[in-house]
Amino acid sequence: MNYEQLLTAADQEGLLVKEQPLTGHDGLIRGSRIAIRKDIETQAEKSCVLAEEIGHYRTSSGNILDQNKVESRKQEYRARLYGYNLKIGLVGLIRAYEAGCGNLYEMAEYLDTTEEYLKEAMQCYHAKYGVYTVVDNYVIYFKPFAVIHMISSAD
């Protein structure tokens, strides 16, 4: 999802998203109000921040800014995973493969995300699924990254 699509999704969830001058964070959520740092340079980067903040809305409760607390770190992980799935998802990785993306830069461009966010998503997927996972007729390997389309033989 690109930034505009995420803004629409946030609106449909009843969330109010505003771009504001922030220091110390790229995005913050309080209740149903999301603030995105106004001076973030690219729409792709803003979309990554917004996806994570929507993830916080859907999965977190309370103030989790203190990442020294185990429960705060768990909530942060859940919110990021939700954001990765919303913004990229396993199907997004397959779509990038089908579109002929040959490297991380091309995949990030195709998925309208930053390379760093894509790397973090793949690390998170690796932690969740292990070395690989199967989606429909595809095997997605996370280390090293590869997508393989399985062809079934006709009997």
Predicted features and spans:
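Active-site hotspot residues in diverse enzymes, especially metal/ion-binding acidic/histidine motifs
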Residues: 1-49, 54-155
